[in-house]
Regions:
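Intrinsically disordered, low-structural-confidence terminal and linker regions
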Residues: 1-8
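Charged/polar, solvent-exposed surface patches and flexible loops
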Residues: 28, 32, 52, 56-59, ...
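S-adenosylmethionine/decaboxylated-SAM
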Residues: 72-180
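A general marker of short, structured functional hotspots
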Residues: 12-17, 30, 37, 53-54, ...
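Class I SAM-dependent transferase core
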Residues: 39-82, 88-93
């Protein structure tokens, strides 16, 4: 338990190495990737109901990090336009198989699953691990709406131990999201 407490302190005090990057808006990304503008995808809605669900989930999340009721820091979750970008990317590409590493509460997972649900096709396989005593399988993906889980398969373990088996036993992966 002491080593876990030390690890939490290390996590809290961890300094990130910042790197240069140029932020790109969704509209610019679509143009760079597909040669189209956002107006070409005007039929794509913004998943407002999903955003409301996720906002409500985080408002209702109780406890302090780290605890069984709040096993991940809130800033583990994607922010800004990342979720809507994943949603729109999946709506445009209509993938059959997506693999992601790292789920935590399941914000990016929810946006992907919303698109798959609306596409009425595709499957998401997610990999996440339980590496702290206060983390539980039940909290992994706990923000994901129940009605979106039918196209989701969660594999518990590290990417190093689980990913190779997924690659050997699945069809080609259309989108791979490494978020762990």
């Amino acid at each position: 338990m002491i080593s876990e407490a030390n690890q939490v302190n290390d996590d809290i005090n961890h300094e990130f190495n910042f790197f240069d990057f140029i932020p790109v808006k969704i509209s610019e990304s679509l143009n760079l990737i597909f040669g189209k503008t956002i107006e070409d995808y005007h039929e794509l809605s913004h998943p407002d109901d999903l955003k409301k669900h996720l906002d409500q989930f985080f408002e209702n999340l109780s406890g302090n990090y780290p605890s069984k009721s709040k096993p991940y820091p809130i800033d583990y979750s994607i922010i800004g336009e990342s979720g809507p970008f994943l949603y729109k990317l999946c709506k445009i590409l209509k993938p059959e198989l997506i693999v992601e590493t790292g789920v935590a509460y399941g914000v990016s997972t929810s946006y992907i699953l919303q698109a798959l649900h609306e596409n009425n096709r595709g499957k998401l396989i997610s990999i996440d691990s339980i590496f702290r005593p206060w983390q539980t399988k039940e909290m992994i993906g706990s923000a994901i709406p129940k009605n979106l889980r039918d196209r989701w398969e969660l594999k518990i373990g590290t990417s190093e131990t689980v990913l190779e088996n997924i690659l050997k036993h699945t069809s080609p992966i259309d989108i791979f999201l490494h978020d762990s």
